[in-house]
Amino acid sequence: MNERLAAEQLLAATGPVPDEPPRDKSPLRLMIVTEDEPFHLAETFEKLFAVSPRWLDIVGVAVLAFAPVGIRGSRLTLLRALGTRYGMSNLLRAAAVVVGNRLRPRRRLGTVLRQSGVAATGFHKLDGEAFAAEMARLDPDVVVTIAFNRIVPPIVLEESRAIWMNVHLGLLPHNRGPAPVFWALHDGEHESGVTVHLTADEVDGGAILAQRRRAIDERRLAVEHRALRLLSVDVLIDALTGLRKGVAPSRNSDLAARWRGVPETSHIAAFLARGNRFF
């Protein structure tokens, strides 16, 4: 589905509504696509369920296996690549956080979803029959990708009735790409933020639906990442509210000049040399 048709379709399906819509108006059906990110995702969902407006119905969550950007393969391949890229000490710290979160039920995504009564279904990929069947069963108005380190296949967007949007932890069009929090700290920037945009063929290139800024007051990536994840819930609600009211998205311009890719070893060395830390 192209960007121009996205907002038109949502309005045709639900119509613009005020902040507190009448109780008899059909709720907006939202499906979430994510990866089982072991750091801050459970907290993010916990906040989303706590603050969701009455007109929002979260009908299901599709969960794919977590894999850091640019690394695919066996667990051994993953560990070797992460150790080489980020250093063994940072890898061990990350492992300690992951194990600690796995041992605490409240920090597990599955626990949060079960307590909220929202069904979660695991998938290996989005362009398969299983995911297509789940989309048909849930029949969402909107699908949002959160903490999703993959590209949504174009065929999925083309064949979907739903509007697709993405949550990006950066101020688009600045720092497009898979590691916006890293690059904001790497470059010594003093503010970052969250952008929710329509999903397009161009990665992080869809029209902007909502955006909020936040001062960077901590040079540890994990702390900043958590703060932005929690802020992303508010920005997502802003975006969905705007679509329901018929607010036109803004153009995501200057795409070619704003792309930042996966950090290389030299970038990580510079990141640390400037006083930043991962944990």
Regions found by a protein language model. Give the residues of each.
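One-carbon transfer enzymes
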Residues: 2-279
